[in-house]
Amino acid sequence: MTAQQHLSRRRMLGMAAFGAAALAGGTTIAAPRAAAAAKSAADNGGYVPAVVIGTGYGAAVSALRLGEAGVQTLMLEMGQLWNQPGPDGNIFCGMLNPDKRSSWFKNRTEAPLGSFLWLDVVNRNIDPYAGVLDRVNYDQMSVYVGRGVGGGSLVNGGMAVEPKRSYFEEILPRVDSSEMYDRYFPRANSMLRVNHIDTKWFEDTEWYKFARVSREQAGKAGLGTVFVPNVYDFGYMQREAAGEVPKSALATEVIYGNNHGKQSLDKTYLAAALGTGKVTIQTLHQVKTIRQTKDGGYALTVEQKDTDGKLLATKEISCRYLFLGAGSLGSTELLVRARDTGTLPNLNSEVGAGWGPNGNIMTARANHMWNPTGAHQSSIPALGIDAWDNSDSSVFAEIAPMPAGLETWVSLYLAITKNPQRGTFVYDAATDRAKLNWTRDQNAPAVNAAKALFDRINKANGTIYRYDLFGTQLKAFADDFCYHPLGGCVLGKATDDYGRVAGYKNLYVTDGSLIPGSVGVNPFVTITALAERNVERIIKQDVTAS
């Protein structure tokens, strides 16, 4: 049997495990042949050789490769497994009529586009629930993160972009870029099932009129665009358009989850991890504290809650190998808390530092009445404006959809800029949380870069900005939230060059907190590839060698 056949078989076994978990209605997910000890530790507390905190990109890579190496591994996920339909027959709700499934314990949705014509017509009152999208609000920056098995892969737009090699070498100079671009990026893209849109279909379909309009307008300003690969199955999307399958991307689904079409991590890495028979996932379990045990291992205090937020149990789970894959916010907070409360006192001062929003700035332009963008829009982006030249004004701008179900004449963009400003997480004893030290002024370089680009497009086309989409005030640039949190445990500073946390043995960071605040494109492919690189070395040198 070939390696690819082994992987396909593991995926099938893993998908069966997810299906069985849905039928059982429990929080423990494992293949039938998974070790009883791991299941017991998941249910009751106890010891398991390896624990991975989180189920996002870096966590999923680590769990799969540990499972393949024969290491019994427990993944702890604070969100739920999203595979049980709600009253409407769908697992996820759409963007236009969100309900409690949309949001992580909110009384009201907090969509990135919060208004239209300055009217509060976008967000809805909802019941607090363990929903799929969280907006974590700090003093002057908010961050969108996914909650559930699969993490951010459940709620992102799926744009699978590799960074410019020159910029990758600038931000991570101690990582061998040849290895990354020759081995680990291809491995990540293959596992993530990255695919490309049929360009002929793109040119003909009504669903991407919005992107073609933005491309034409960028061209008038002398700017080029590039097609962007995705983990959403473009072949499935074409069948959606033909009326052959249920719609998802063509039914305004994305930020609150896709019911069809998207190859999120539960269908790729995590399914393969479960299929090894060595990996167990425990949902609705949040790690609160980490301490080192006398034998050099780690003990975790873990809270189990239900989907209404009720505390059901507090457990202690111990392990020899601990991988933090809870994302830039989650992993950083756990380590900042551990350092500053004294449970891991040897963590260095770099823990919490080097955080950035990947230069994220959202903006929109008002088109002329004779230049409509289309009432029918795919929710999955397919084009980007590539104005990244490694200068301080570099921009890669995702041409974003605005699938409102009616004509808006709006061109929407998520600009990724080269903002050098960085924030720092510090421990707040009063709330027992990590507080982000970041000011709106620190986003001025990002706003200036985005403004320079879109001023150029507006001038070439005789258009203006939309000022009514980001709240009740006049505002053309949304600089107070981001989709791409990066940093907090930067590679080579808080850790060694492979994610080993400085000051401790067998403690690793494996997610976006390793990347120093910026990567110049949508970051999940880089996070995945970097995790592949790091865990390969860790398993060889730290796990199998011992």
UniProtKB/Swiss-Prot annotation:
It catalyses: cholesterol + O2 = cholest-5-en-3-one + H2O2; cholest-5-en-3-one = cholest-4-en-3-one. The active site is at E398 (proton acceptor), H484 (proton acceptor). Predicted to be exported by the Tat system. The position of the signal peptide cleavage has been experimentally proven. GO terms for molecular function: cholesterol oxidase activity; flavin adenine dinucleotide binding; steroid Delta-isomerase activity. GO terms for cellular component: extracellular region. It comes from the Bacteria. FAD binds at Y57, G58, E77, G152, N156, G157, M159, V287, G512, F524. Its main location: secreted. The keyword DNA damage does not apply. InterPro entries: Cholesterol_Oxidase, FAD/NAD-bd_sf, GMC_OxRdtase_N, GMC_OxRtase_C, TAT_signal. One of its GO terms (biological process) is cholesterol catabolic process. Keywords: Cholesterol metabolism, FAD, Flavoprotein, Isomerase, Lipid metabolism, Oxidoreductase, Secreted, Signal, Steroid metabolism, Sterol metabolism. Its EC number is 1.1.3.6, 5.3.3.1. Residues 1-42 form the signal peptide. It is found in: Secreted. SUPFAM superfamilies: FAD-linked reductases, C-terminal domain (SSF54373), FAD/NAD(P)-binding domain (SSF51905). Pathway: Steroid metabolism; cholesterol degradation. The keyword Kinase does not apply. Its cofactor is FAD. PANTHER family: CHOLESTEROL OXIDASE, FAD-DEPENDENT OXIDOREDUCTASE 2 FAD BINDING DOMAIN-CONTAINING PROTEIN. Bifunctional enzyme that catalyzes the oxidation and isomerization of cholesterol to cholestenone (cholest-4-en-3-one), an initial step in the cholesterol degradation process. The cholesterol degradation pathway allows the bacterium to utilize cholesterol as its sole source of carbon and energy. Belongs to the GMC oxidoreductase family. Monomer. This is Cholesterol oxidase. The gene is choA.
